[in-house]
Structure formats: C-alpha cells, structure tokens
Amino acid sequence: MKLTRMQFDVLVNLMEVQKAEPTALGISSKEVRMLVNELIKDGLLDETQTVTEKGIAALEPYRTKRVIFLAAGFGSRLRPATINVPKPMVRVHGKPIICSAIEAALQAGIEEIYIVRGYLGECFELLLKKYPQVRLIDNPDYETSNNVSSAMKVRHLMQNAYVMEADLLINNPTIFKKYHYTSNCLGVPVEKTDDWCVISENGYAKQLIKGGVNCHHLFSIYYWTAEEGAKLPAHLEEMFSSEGGRDLFWDIAPMNRYNEHYKIEVRECSFADISEIDTYNELQMLDSAYLVK
C-alpha cells in the first residue's frame, strides 16, 4: 500500500523510538493519536503501537538498499597524505575516513555497499576483510573526467540508494536512515557561503551553485527513491555525452540540468554531524598525528 507522508513518519518514528513523539513529527498530540488509530485499524500497528509485519511490508518500498561511494579522485589538495593512498583511505585517528560512513550505513541496516575506485584503487581492497558487504567497481576514466564518469559506472544502481562522496568523515551516524519517503540531499542552513550550496524553494532543491546567500551548504550525500533513481541513468548518459559533460560533477544532472524531473528534499543537518577535510592543514587540525614533530 502507498503510505501518506504522515503515516510513514509515524511508523518510522515508532520503529526508532517505540513511541510516537509529536515534537519529532511536527504535529499535535491529537493528530498523532488519530494517525496511530488509523494505522491500528489498517493493521500496520498492533494495540501496543508496535509495527506489525504488514507495517514492515508497507515500509519496504521506502527502505534504503545500498550506499554508493564515488571514490575515484586524486585528493590532490590533501597531499602529502594522498601520495600513497586515495583520500577516502587516509586515516583519521587510526581509521580510514571512509570507514566512518561504511559503519554508519551498516548500523542503519544498509547491507549493499559499492565503492567506485580509480586513483590507487588497490588500496580499497584492505576494506574487504573487515566489511564483506563491500563491492569494488573500477573507473578507468577517472584521470580524464570529473566524477560524472564514476556515477556512470553505477547509474543503474541508484534506486533506493545513497550516492555520496567517499571522503566525508561522519561524526553523527544517525544521519544514515533505514527508510526515506523522498529523494533528498543533506545540507546545513547558512546565511552565506563561498562553497557549493543548494538554493531551495518550499524545502526542495532547485539549483546547485558555488557560493550563495540564505541557502544550504551542501554535504554531497544524496538519497534517491526507486522512482527517481530510475530517471538518473538516462539523464547522466545525456549529460556525459554532451559537450563538456565529462568535466562536470555528476549531481549537476539532477540538481541543475534536469531538476524539473526531480523532487529533492533538502534534509537539514549541522556542521557537527560531518567533517569535510579539504586540505592538509585541516587534516592536521583534526588529527595531531599529522603535525611535524
């Protein structure tokens, strides 16, 4: 059955905290009671407000099935740390950066993990023993194109999937969710930024730009529903084959060129949730092991 947004939110809230919280849901206690009674009547909850097998089945179309890491780049701004390893495999406090996201995904019950590799790709094989869920996909085009070439290698896997950069240090693993109702991107509300940001309208992304005001600083973590993930292959193929298309970031396709075909919710987080390590100096500030003794 097709769930309404509020039915979905109540079911997921009950699965996560075993109690429908009006504050978390953004509605009144009366509305929560009405929704709970409706879900009990439909057999999605039992009398103790526990999600039933029928309720779990109703949530299945919204379940996150996989995480795709785009990890083929050079990470040149992080040299010398990236001379011998790709940026996602640079260690922070003794652990490769990418492990923070892999472990957060596994904690959320997401079992399929794909890593598109390129520069020093063999280094990612070190992950296979600890994380047997990981599947490695090679991108031989990483030297001559932007990350759109990595997205092209996995374009048919983007349904019910997170698609993200592999060099984000996840400080708050709860940003990874087992269920999503809509496609979304992760962003922090800011008054002004010189970085990549999302211009939104009524909570939905309308454009991705470099530098903006009253916008959302973008963390490149996207979720795609089954319906919208199915649109991505054709749009990526068309952009990739267009003049200059190989030089673009992959998310220019859904966020800019073909945005009218997508409904991408801006999911808010904070700068404390994720660390972006863009330079060697930032790496040193985060982990004193990189300071010259």
At which residue positions do the language-model features occur?
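Short amphipathic alpha-helical interface segments
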Residues: 1-28
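Conserved core of the sugar-phosphate nucleotidyltransferase
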Residues: 9, 21, 172-245
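Short amphipathic alpha-helical interaction segments
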Residues: 26-41
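A short, conserved structural fragment
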Residues: 40-50
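Conserved beta-strand segments of alpha/beta enzyme cores
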Residues: 88, 133-135, 263-265
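Conserved beta-loop-beta/alpha segment of the NTase-like Rossmann-fold superfamily
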Residues: 124-196
